[in-house]
């Protein structure tokens, strides 16, 4: 009985409400694995450049989480960005190549900002930069973002 009480006590002692994390996802288009002045993969000395000077990227990489094994699900940028936003492959989110009326299904998909708000409604989300909406002009706000720089038409 004493062992049970100790286990229950210890399990409740360490239950502390953690603050929600700040999440900043920076995605660069056509970023080379060796296009920065720091090791993209600390285990591989070939994963940096002595030519490029990227002190701000280096500082971010040193103080944040670094993803070293990312693979594009498509050979061009739009379906890749939409896969990151939804966690789905292009075959599942239905954007594979420019075509009209593809956004009908896409607008219904869960996205990172929508999921964050489901977990905690006080999350504030924003999107700045490339927003490719060649057809149907769906907006970042429709995908769950609170703030954006709008349709950038690229």
Where are these regions (language model features)?
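Formylglycine-dependent sulfatase
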Residues: 3, 16-154
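Sec-dependent N-terminal signal peptides
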Residues: 4-14
């Amino acid at each position: 009985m004493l062992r049970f009480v100790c286990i229950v006590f210890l399990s409740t002692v360490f239950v502390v409400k953690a603050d929600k994390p700040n999440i900043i996802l920076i995605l660069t288009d056509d970023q080379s694995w060796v296009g920065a002045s720091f090791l993209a993969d600390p285990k591989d000395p070939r994963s940096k450049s002595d030519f490029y000077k990227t002190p701000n990227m280096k500082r971010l990489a040193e103080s944040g989480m670094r993803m070293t094994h990312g693979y594009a699900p498509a050979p061009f940028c739009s379906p890749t960005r939409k896969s990151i936003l939804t966690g789905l492959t292009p075959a599942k989110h239905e954007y594979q190549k420019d075509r009209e009326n593809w956004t009908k299904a896409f607008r219904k998909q869960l996205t990172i900002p929508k999921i964050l708000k489901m977990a905690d409604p006080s999350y504030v989300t924003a999107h700045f930069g490339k927003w490719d909406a060649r057809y149907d002009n769906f907006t970042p706000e429709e995908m769950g973002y609170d703030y954006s720089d709008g349709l950038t038409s690229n």
